[in-house]
Amino acid sequence: MSADPTRTRVHDGEVDASPPPGRGEEQVRVAGGRVMLALSLLIGWFLLYLLVLSSFEQNHAQNVLYGELRTQLAEGTAPTGAPVRAGAPVALLDIPSLDVESLVVVEGTRSRQLQDGPGHRAGTVLPGQEGVSVVAGRSTSYGKPFADLPDIVRGARVVVTTAQGEFEYLVTGTRFDGDPMPAPPGEGAGRLTLVTSTGTGSWLSRLQPSRTVYVDAELRSGAAAAGPRSAPDPEPTLLASHVDRLSLAELALALQVLLGALAGFVWAWNRWSRKAAWIAGAPVVVAALWLVSSIGARLLPALI
């Protein structure tokens, strides 16, 4: 008698419940692909922030600083010497040949300060004063105010406006790391040294600069009396990454904000309509990404 094909046959041995061959490897590949995609998107976002979006951030800071400095100049309260708060506006910079106009110079040359504009190096006299004044600026990000500085020609005008008046400098030369330094200016003379970075090859090489550029300009006449100097910045070089506890603490908090924003977006995606989740969640996630990028950029060399 033949067996009924519709009846279930019971197997007395052990049942192999493992997934079919190859499924585990496929899941690993899918997970790895998602991780690589996420990393690529994060790197792409950070490059977009550095090369494009950071310019809007500096433009906003410059507008605020310009209004603050103009008010101080009108009231006669702009600084003429130490102490000067880090990040405070100290001068207006114009370089006609490079189309640099009314650029606000802030106090300090750390990465945090150079996000707002060119920075005056602590420990040197303020622009326009007797002695050597050093002003550093970025070449690639945050508006790249000194991107064309290596191409400046001898004799180009550099005009600086401070609480002590308007001062005109003439460029005398460009030098790089290892080149001989010019002799100190004589009594009653002033020099302005503009500093930025440059790379070799494509424009992307500026993200990893290899050389520091120094442009020396001599004051034509009428150096102002030098005010008190602040303590020199202990940071060894403007091309070195600087990690401080404050920036790390701020970055940790910003990452928590980003994780919270992502968690909220996922929750809204599963509970609300897709349109409502995008409208409510996308701006919050972008703002958190912007915050993380802005703080994270402070860990990079100050001149890029």
Specify the residue positions occupied by each region the protein language model found.
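Acidic/Ser-Thr/Pro-Gly-rich, low-complexity N-terminal segments
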Residues: 1-21
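A broadly tuned "polar low-complexity/structure-edge" signature
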Residues: 2, 171, 189-191, 259-263, ...
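Solvent-exposed, non-transmembrane regions of membrane-associated and secreted proteins
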Residues: 16, 21-250, 296-304
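Hydrophobic alpha-helical membrane-embedded or membrane-associated segments
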Residues: 34, 38-42, 258, 281-289
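Selective detector of the "anchor" transmembrane alpha-helix that sits immediately C-terminal
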Residues: 247-268
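Alpha-helical transmembrane segments forming the membrane-embedded cores
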Residues: 261-304
